[in-house]
UniProtKB/Swiss-Prot annotation:
<dbReference type="GO" id="GO:0006412">
    <property type="term" value="P:translation"/>
</dbReference>
<keyword id="KW-0694">RNA-binding</keyword>
<protein>
    <recommendedName>
        <fullName>Large ribosomal subunit protein uL14c</fullName>
    </recommendedName>
</protein>
<comment type="similarity">
    <text>Belongs to the universal ribosomal protein uL14 family.</text>
</comment>
<dbReference type="InterPro" id="IPR019972">
    <property type="entry name" value="Ribosomal_uL14_CS"/>
</dbReference>
<dbReference type="InterPro" id="IPR036853">
    <property type="entry name" value="Ribosomal_uL14_sf"/>
</dbReference>
<dbReference type="InterPro" id="IPR000218">
    <property type="entry name" value="Ribosomal_uL14"/>
</dbReference>
<keyword id="KW-0150">Chloroplast</keyword>
<dbReference type="InterPro" id="IPR005745">
    <property type="entry name" value="Ribosomal_uL14_bac-type"/>
</dbReference>
<dbReference type="GO" id="GO:0022625">
    <property type="term" value="C:cytosolic large ribosomal subunit"/>
</dbReference>
<keyword id="KW-0699">rRNA-binding</keyword>
<dbReference type="GO" id="GO:0003735">
    <property type="term" value="F:structural constituent of ribosome"/>
</dbReference>
<keyword id="KW-0689">Ribosomal protein</keyword>
<comment type="function">
    <text>Binds to 23S rRNA.</text>
</comment>
<dbReference type="GO" id="GO:0009507">
    <property type="term" value="C:chloroplast"/>
</dbReference>
<keyword id="KW-0934">Plastid</keyword>
<dbReference type="GO" id="GO:0070180">
    <property type="term" value="F:large ribosomal subunit rRNA binding"/>
</dbReference>
Length: 122
């Protein structure tokens, strides 16, 4: 469960290292975001000499949360960290590599480019 002011790791090589959620895209007063939700975030830490800079406002999709994800078949998945992938306005990832495992639910939400770049889909 990601809410405003939550810090997230970045799971791609776009140049950002850490994000802070400032808004959840969707309804006007939604409190929590889960895997597959798009957020507006600010970059808190970035790699030197990268196209993305600190304090830049970007869009990202959540790929891992430490809160449990319950599937319809009864399986529960929990990750060690909260992580997101930086995306552009069309929903394509800005990076060319994805680090770590991501959830299968992203494929159902039409983030197929992110799923194809991921090394492991759970």
């Amino acid at each position: 469960m990601i809410q405003s002011q939550t810090h997230l790791n970045v799971a791609d090589n776009s140049g950002a290292r850490e994000l802070m959620c400032i808004r959840i895209i969707g309804t006007s007063n939604r409190r929590y975001a889960h895997i597959g939700d798009i957020i507006i975030a600010v970059i808190k830490e970035a790699v030197p000499n990268s196209p993305l800079e600190r304090s830049e406002v970007i869009r990202a999709v959540i790929v891992r949360t430490s809160k449990e994800l319950k599937r319809d078949n009864g399986m529960i998945i929990r990750y060690d960290d909260n992580a997101a992938v930086v995306i552009d306005q069309e929903g394509n990832p800005k990076g060319t590599r994805i680090f770590g495992a991501i959830a299968r639910e992203l494929r159902q939400l039409n983030f197929t480019k992110i799923v194809s770049l991921a090394p492991e889909v759970l």
